[in-house]
UniProtKB/Swiss-Prot annotation:
Domain Alphavirus-like MT: start-end pairs: 72-281
InterPro entries assigned: (+)RNA_virus_helicase_core_dom, Alphavirus-like_MT_dom, DNA/RNA_pol_sf, P-loop_NTPase, RNA-dep_RNA_pol_alsuvir, RNA-dir_pol_PSvirus, Virgaviridae_RdRp
Region (Helicase): 830-1085
UniProt domain RdRp catalytic: residue ranges: 1380-1493
Identification of the protein by name: Replicase large subunit
Catalytic function, reaction form: RNA(n) + a ribonucleoside 5'-triphosphate = RNA(n+1) + diphosphate; ATP + H2O = ADP + phosphate + H(+)
Length: 1616
């Protein structure tokens, strides 16, 4: 039995501790199932599409307000009051959710289109035309239906099934769906309906008189009516203007007229009766008859919208259930009838009772008014000295928090500025539970000054009143001004009445015995009201006929039912099927039956593939060598085409490509296009191809590319001809941009109707007098174009200047054999080179002009190559061997030579891949070199709608050669190129920093006078190019036009503020734009874009890093310099420049937002607000909760604004919060650890890693206790400490487990943004008495000295009393040429995480160093279970383990623990250098070392929340360790230095001077500016937003080194 109980207890304990795997698995499974159920429940929510454009804040408002829906925000529709408009649909759906589905529902003033779209066939909408806007709104609803149906029709879709019933009902019986009567007079019939009837009123009850509402509901037999309307509690006050901030709307009241409108919008306003709305708000019962009444019940308020419901109540039910056994029933009923008559009359009278008589009802109906008070604000006129007064609603808690605090101010401190400072501070942030800082009270910022004046006056009067009471001052005769001040004092005394009292006092409402009387001004009629009433007419709204659409929908549904028998019918593309039926004019049912027959193999046709992929279709279209037996095979066939001569006789010319837009799979030409004259007078329609989508190309990839190239020429010619025909038809409506590209000649008048920019066009489109359009080859004389008599007009364009596409088509058609292009067997080599790698230079060095051919894309490039090749005076490059691609294609066969040995194509990747294949074939070469850049701008398909598949863009080559040295680009651009190219890109340029950018205020600021641009001017878009040319700039090109060109200086301009797709980080256009210059590039832009970010990154690249990209940088000279200056820092005195604003700017860039905090009163607000704390077992002396008041001396005020806090006052609350956040918040992460054995192994590793081999064993001849050691310890102590030992007899040991607790009054600044949301905990100090320190201090001092003497100081640095110079010496021999990993271990809550295991490790280290067993045991027990006493704050508690922050082993103990921790996890035998100091560590390992999972090991073994960081530079004890090629320099953290300059605890000027000297000591190295660049990089690693900071480093040196100048950083607080 005992064994069973033991086993049961053990199992229970394991379960509680989480060690039972079965229970853990069950818990995980349960958690998983719960999460799945929760997500499934969320997915089942109704889905609502929010199409209107709203901000992120408005998105959160809608999502939080309506959790019942799954809202999808598309942000695709810009509209007025977009949030309110979008919420209208959510409000409608919320109201409809309250109604049982299918129940007859009346939508009062509703939107019948919304119900049709939702498929609600059971809703009837009463939509009376009470105003012109109502008619407009109703027409808009019908337009939305018509638009919806037209979209379905355009997409060959039909009304979905769930909408079909509703649309059928509207098509057949529109009066059943919507009527235009008021709800009170609605004639809708409820025949054949027996269920309950419901109604909804969405923002429509304003116009229904409240006295008629109940009767109207009863007339329609409505069971429950759900309503929603806008309202604000402030309308019950005297305010004539009330804002609804969430929806950006407002109410304006003028007498009984209440106007609703949206702010900052020109939409029409809505006017209602204020008294009528007030009845809906204040009344509870709405009588319907002498028996039934509708009772209003408030539901919820969401986003300025109130929801309520009106339930039908039968009042006769109040007494029908009364028991009457044992009495005379007749007498009972008679008495009840009399009583009921009286009670019913009283109930009807009480139905008008105001709801505000009950305070709980007020809080229920007006939740925003809860805990709000009315505060008067005062103002005075400077001209008339007239005082004015108004009232505002403010949180009661906020008011009394301010008043109670400022009431404690002394007379001298009670000033308006101090009150305003406190009010502004607590309004911006309040400390919650001593942890979180947040804004607690939402008080309008515009009221803070007036409120502060009110609080100040109130407190002044309260102080005066107290003085009068104390002195028992007797009042005598009073002057008028004294009476006025008495009235003000009286108003202040009654500043906070309840809402009810204020309403009654202002006579807004009047309470009578039986009813609520609302007093409003008499009604009046304005001119606008009179005009509307005179011309008001009532007409019936026309009905929208949708019967035809419903019939088409029915046919489509029947066809889809036929198709449902197919396999995978759920994936059937209904849109394509509907489009096919419409284009072929086929009945959907017939088409469906044919498809089913084909797919069921019942049509006699066998399909050769299942999925119509490109590969399957191409395979199916190939001719089969041998058909399978018994199978029907469909193959392509040759189709005879009419001859060219026959076509010319009819004026037609068929130009379809190899795979054009006709059904045949291939073409064979019986006759070829022999000359360009065959194009003359061909009809334009024969050249225009409306459908540019090719069928599948067949053959190898190169053949497919060549076919696609021919098709692209056809498409380009077709587009050019089509545009010219359109110009001829629309000459009178040509915009300015089109006029620059086209020209139209009137033949009769010989005058250009639209003058072209070019002259002597080669061809054009002619319009004859018969309104026919033909393509004509043009001839010119001295008067212009030679025309014919039957020509009416001639149109030309920039594409018709030359016969480009026509001549290319003629040439390529001659090359086809049986309709198929031939592929060359020549070897194709791709030379992939970076920008400026010398591709043209290499071509000229390799080419043999006698037997090779060079082809380039542009004429300028061809002329440049000829000029460079013939520079020696010998003509070797001619127009026969250096040609443009277009010239070669257009004039093929006309030159003297047709065959070449080698072909060189410059910028070949800018060409169509099919064009490159044709060039290789036409040159008849043995090898072709295609020079290009895979990362620059590729071939761009200029014909919209013409397909150029992605796999066609890749050129098939036999070999790839790379060129990765740029002769053009400066070093910073080369740095960018290394991010885009594989392999190392190098440069030969001596320029390092060449790129810059400038943000311009707008496109208008770019003009030649105010902004002359240097060098070549480039743009990204043609529109920007034209804009610059029109403003007077010369020689402007786009980036695409200058690819391959080189310029010394470039000015890149962007004038387009809208997003441009080609401006992206990985865009080839950006790459080309950055690589055109050799000296400088400046980017002028009107908006921030990725290129600005790239240039800013390049500006920050250090110069020494850019030297790595130079190919001509030798290493021998560097090695010689390195050997001379080894271990010595270059010293360059830092100039003393800068100002205070430099330090402020740098601080704000690194820590944005910290300097704006108003945290001077954080400690005050924590004491003033309620607080809830979770504490461990402790004893609190509550008599210490109220600190004794102290005179606070003013401190110096810093000019540099940082997040530094004011010193805090020690007290119960402050000390307890610090203890909770520090000592009571220790992590528990460790797993199961064998403490003694593991500690022994860790210490073994510690001694093997850090101690010299000969000193790993303790010196037995060494005594820890000696007079010398005690004298050394005493010499380090202060006289006060020694005086405390005077009465110590040293007979017995004091209580070693007793500690004292205190806090540091000055909070430690964190160099992050946590101060914006957190209340930093003070550092706690737990320390022994001096008597214990006198015993163990000398002991551990000797142990520490012995340990440090044994450490391998060449590799390890235990930072104890080391100067920055000693740190520099330690790291000075690091070889910067050896790649290293710089590691930092960051441990959170280091002291409080240490438990029994850490103590065991530390005790084992001390034991091995020679600590005696007895003292070791005493020390161990003194750190096991310890008692903490805080006498100042009145706190006593017990702690287990933890590092005590004030005993004699705090620093060295933390140091050996962090060193032991790292030795147990990292391969210390590979370590190059390592430094340890408290919880800080810095390690240098060789690059590429493998490390274990540090986080897991630190958690499970060491109970540490640890993170391991890899960095370029080390950060150690608040200092940056910068290693370089000459040694090492240690810079104090400049951001930490600036943070200290914002200190708010400096007492006086003497204290400030001591403060300056201490900062000078730690920041001495900043005087050396030689390594500021590396310091910038180091700071940038920690603070990503930090700018280059040499200016601020110099500023710090300037102020720290000058005593007088340093005083200007602070102001005297006593004089402020």
């Amino acid at each position: 039995m005992a064994y069973t109980q033991t086993a049961t207890s053990s199992a229970l304990l394991e379960t509680v501790r989480g060690n039972n795997t079965l229970v853990n698995d069950l818990a995980k499974r349960r958690l998983y199932d719960t999460a799945v159920d929760e997500f499934n429940a969320r997915d089942r929510r109704p889905k609502v599409n929010f199409s209107k454009v709203v901000s992120e804040e408005q998105t959160l408002i809608a999502t939080k307000a309506y959790p019942e829906f799954q809202i999808t925000f598309y942000n695709t529709q810009n509209a007025v009051h977009s949030l309110a408009g979008g919420l209208r649909s959510l409000e409608l759906e919320y109201l409809m959710m309250q109604i049982p589905y299918g129940s007859l529902t009346y939508d009062i003033g509703g939107n019948f289109a919304s119900h049709l779209f939702k498929g609600r066939a059971y809703v009837h909408c009463c939509m009376p035309n009470l105003d012109v806007r109502d008619i407009m709104r109703h027409e808009g609803q019908k337009d939305s239906i018509e638009l919806y149906l037209s979209r379905l029709e355009r997409g060959n879709k039909h009304v979905p099934n769930f909408q079909k019933e509703a649309f059928d009902r509207y098509a057949e019986m529109p009066n059943e769906v919507v009527c235009h009567d008021t709800f009170q007079t609605c004639r809708h019939s409820q025949e054949c309906y027996t269920g309950r009837v419901y109604a909804i009123a969405l923002h429509s009850i304003y116009d229904i008189p409240a006295d008629e509402f109940g009767a109207a509901l009863l007339r329609k037999n409505v069971h429950v009516c759900y309503a929603a309307f806008h309202f604000s509690e402030n309308l019950l006050l005297e305010d004539s203007h009330v804002n609804l901030d969430e929806i950006n709307a407002c109410f304006q009241r003028d007498g009984d007229r209440l106007t609703f409108s949206f702010a900052s919008e020109s939409t029409l306003n809505y006017s209602h009766s204020y008294s009528n709305i007030l009845k809906y708000v204040c009344k509870t019962y709405f009588p319907a008859s002498n028996r039934e009444v509708y009772m209003k019940e408030f539901l919820v308020t969401r986003v300025n919208t109130w929801f309520c419901k009106f339930s039908r109540i039968d009042t006769f039910l109040l007494y029908k259930g009364v028991a009457h056994k044992g009495v005379d029933s007749e007498q009972f009923y008679k008495a009840m009838e009399d009583a009921w008559h009286y009670k019913k009359t009283l109930a009807m009278c009480n139905s008008e009772r105001i709801l505000l008589e009950d305070s709980s009802s007020v809080n229920y109906w007006f939740p925003k008014m809860r805990d709000m008070v009315i505060v008067p604000l005062f103002d005075i006129s400077l001209e008339t000295s007239k005082r004015t007064r108004k009232e505002v609603l403010v949180s009661k808690d906020f008011v009394y928090t301010v008043l109670n605090h400022i009431r404690t101010y002394q007379a001298k401190a009670l000033t308006y500025s101090n009150v305003l400072s406190f009010v502004e501070s607590i309004r911006s942030r309040v400390i919650i539970n001593g942890v979180t800082a947040r804004s607690e009270w939402d008080v309008d910022k515009s009221l803070l000054q007036s409120l502060s004046m009110t609080f100040f006056l109130h407190t002044k009067l309260a102080v005066l009143k107290d003085d009068l009471l104390i002195s028992k001052f007797a009042l005598g005769p009073k002057t008028v001004s004294q009476h006025v001040w008495d009235e003000i004092s009286l108003a202040f005394g009654n500043a906070f009445p309840s809402i009810k009292e204020r309403l009654i006092n202002r006579k807004l409402i009047k309470i009578t015995e039986n009813a609520l009387e609302i007093r409003v001004p008499d009604l009046y009629v304005t001119f606008h009201d009179r005009l509307v009433s005179e011309y008001k007419m009532s007409v019936d709204m026309p009905v929208l006929d949708i019967r035809k659409k419903m019939e088409e929908t029915e046919e489509m549904y029947n066809a889809l039912s036929e198709l449902s028998v197919l396999k995978n019918s759920d994936k059937f593309d209904v849109d394509v099927f509907s489009q096919m039926c419409q284009s072929l004019e086929v009945d959907p049912m017939t088409a469906a039956k044919v498809i089913v027959a084909v797919m069921s193999n019942e049509s006699g046709l066998t399909l050769t593939f299942e999925q119509p992929t490109e590969a399957n279709v191409a395979l199916a279209l190939q001719d089969s060598e041998k058909a399978s037996d018994g199978a029907l095979v469909v193959t392509s066939r040759d189709v005879e085409e009419p001859s060219i001569k026959g076509s010319m006789a009819r004026g037609e010319l068929q130009l379809a490509g190899l795979s054009g837009d006709v059904p045949e799979s291939s073409y064979t030409r019986s006759e070829e296009i022999e000359s360009l004259e065959q194009f003359h007078m061909a009809t334009a329609s024969s050249l225009i191809h409306k459908q540019m989508c090719s069928i599948v190309y067949t053959g190898p990839l190169k053949v497919q590319q060549m076919k696609n190239f021919i098709d692209s020429l056809v498409a380009s010619l077709s587009a050019a001809v089509s545009n010219l025909v359109k110009i001829l038809k629309d000459t009178a409506a040509i915009d300015l941009e089109t006029r620059q590209k086209f020209g139209v000649l009137d033949v009769a008048s010989k005058r250009w109707l639209v003058k072209p920019s070019a002259k002597n066009h080669a061809w054009g489109v002619v319009e004859t007098h018969a309104r026919k359009y033909h393509v004509a080859l043009l001839e010119h004389d001295e008067f212009g174009i030679i025309t014919c008599d039957n020509w009416r007009r001639v149109a030309v364009s920039s594409e018709s200047v030359v016969y480009s596409d026509m001549a290319k088509l003629r040439t390529l058609r001659r090359l086809l054999k049986d309709g198929e292009p031939h592929v060359s067997s020549a070897k194709v080599v791709l030379v992939d080179g970076v920008p400026g790698c010398g591709k043209t230079k290499e071509i000229l060095s390799r080419v043999n002009f006698e037997e090779d051919l060079i082809l380039v894309p542009g004429r300028q490039a061809a002329e440049m190559i000829r000029r460079r090749a013939n520079a020696s005076g010998i003509i070797v490059a001619t127009k026969d061997n250096v040609r443009t691609v277009d010239s070669f294609l257009m004039n093929y066969g006309k030159g003297a030579r047709c065959q070449f040995k080698r072909l060189f194509i410059d910028e070949g990747l800018m060409l169509h891949t099919g064009c490159v294949n044709f060039l290789v074939e036409m040159s008849l070469c043995d090898i072709a070199y295609v020079y290009g850049d895979t990362q620059q701008i590729p071939y761009i398909n200029r014909v919209t709608g013409f397909p150029y598949p992605a796999h066609f863009a890749k050129l098939e080559v036999d070999e790839v050669e790379t060129r990765r040295t740029t002769l053009r680009c400066p070093a910073d651009v080369t740095h960018f190129l290394n991010q885009r190219y594989e392999g190392h890109v190098m440069c030969t340029s001596s320029e390092k920093k060449s790129v810059s950018q400038e943000m311009v205020s707008g496109a208008a600021s770019i003009n030649p006078v105010s902004k002359p641009l240097k060098g070549k001017i480039l743009t990204f878009t043609q529109s920007d190019k034209e804009a610059l040319l029109s403003r007077g700039y010369a020689d402007v090109h786009t980036v695409h036009e200058v690819q391959g060109e080189t310029y010394a200086d470039v000015s890149l301009v962007r004038l387009t503020p809208t997003p441009v797709s080609i401006i992206a980080r990985d865009s080839p256009h950006v790459l080309v734009s950055l690589s055109r210059h050799t000296k400088s590039l400046k980017y002028y832009t009107v908006v921030m874009d990725p290129l600005v970010s790239i240039i800013r990154d390049l500006e920050r690249v250090s110069s020494y890093l850019l030297d790595m990209y130079k190919v001509d940088a030798g290493t021998q000279x560097q090695l010689q310099v390195d050997s001379v200056f080894k271990n010595f820092n270059l010293f360059v005195a830092a100039p003393k420049t800068g100002d205070i604003s430099d330090m402020q700017f740098y601080y704000d860039k690194c820590l944005p937002g910290n300097s704006t905090l108003l945290n001077n009163y954080d400690a005050v607000t924590m004491k003033l607000t309620d607080i809830s704390l979770n504490v461990k077992d402790c004893i609190l002396d509550m008599s210490k909760s109220v600190a004794a008041p102290k005179d606070v001396k003013p401190t110096l005020i810093p000019m540099v604004r940082t997040a530094a806090e004011m010193p805090r006052q020690t007290g119960l609350l402050e000390n307890l919060v610090a203890m909770i956040k520090r000592n009571f918040n220790s992590p528990e992460l460790s797993g199961v650890v064998d403490i003694e054995n593991t500690a022994s192994l860790v210490v073994d590793k510690f001694f093997d890693s850090y101690l010299l081999k000969e000193k790993r064993k303790p010196n037995k001849n060494f005594s820890l206790f000696s007079r010398e050691s005690l004298n050394r310890w005493i010499a380090k102590q202060e006289q006060v400490t020694i005086g405390q030992l005077a009465d110590f007899d040293f007979v017995d040991l004091p209580a070693v487990d007793q500690y004292r607790h205190m806090i540091k009054a000055q909070p430690k600044q964190k160099l992050d943004l946590s101060i914006q949301t957190e209340y930093p905990a003070l550092q706690t100090i737990v320390y022994h008495s001096k008597k214990i320190n006198a015993i163990f201090g000398p002991l551990f001092s000797e142990l520490t000295r012995q340990l440090l003497d044994s450490i391998d100081s060449s590799r390890f640095l235990f930072f104890t009393r080391k100067t920055p110079a000693q740190i520099e010496d330690f790291f000075g021999d690091l070889d910067s040429h050896v790649p290293m990993d710089v590691l930092e271990l960051d441990v959170s809550k280091y002291d409080k995480s240490q438990n029994e295991f850490h103590c065991a490790v530390e005790y084992e280290i001390w034991r091995r160093l020679g600590l005696e067993d007895f003292l070791a045991e005493v020390w161990k027990q003194g750190h096991r279970k310890t008692t903490l006493k805080d006498y100042t704050a009145g706190i006593k508690t017990c702690l287990w383990y933890q590092r005590k922050s004030g005993d004699v082993t705090t620093f060295i103990g933390n140091t050996v623990i962090i060193a032991s921790c790292l030795a147990s996890m990292l391969p210390m035998e590979k370590l190059i250098k390592g430094a340890f100091c408290g919880d800080d560590s810095l390690l240098y390992f060789p690059k590429g070392c493998e490390y274990p999972d540090i986080q897991q090991a630190a958690n499970l073994m060491w109970n540490f929340e640890a993170k391991l960081f890899k960095k370029q530079y080390g950060y150690f004890c608040g200092r940056y360790v910068i290693h370089h090629d000459r040694g090492c320099i240690v810079y104090y953290d400049p951001l930490k230095l600036i943070s200290k300059l914002g200190a708010k605890h400096i007492k006086d000027w003497d204290h400030l001077e001591e403060f300056r000297r201490s900062l000078c000591d730690v920041a001495e190295s900043l005087n050396n500016c030689a390594y500021y660049t590396q310091l910038d990089d180091a700071v940038g690693e920690v603070h990503k937003t930090a700018p280059p900071g040499s200016f601020v480093y110099k500023s710090l040196v300037k102020y720290l080194s000058d005593k007088v100048l340093f005083r200007s950083l602070f102001l005297d607080g006593s004089s402020c």
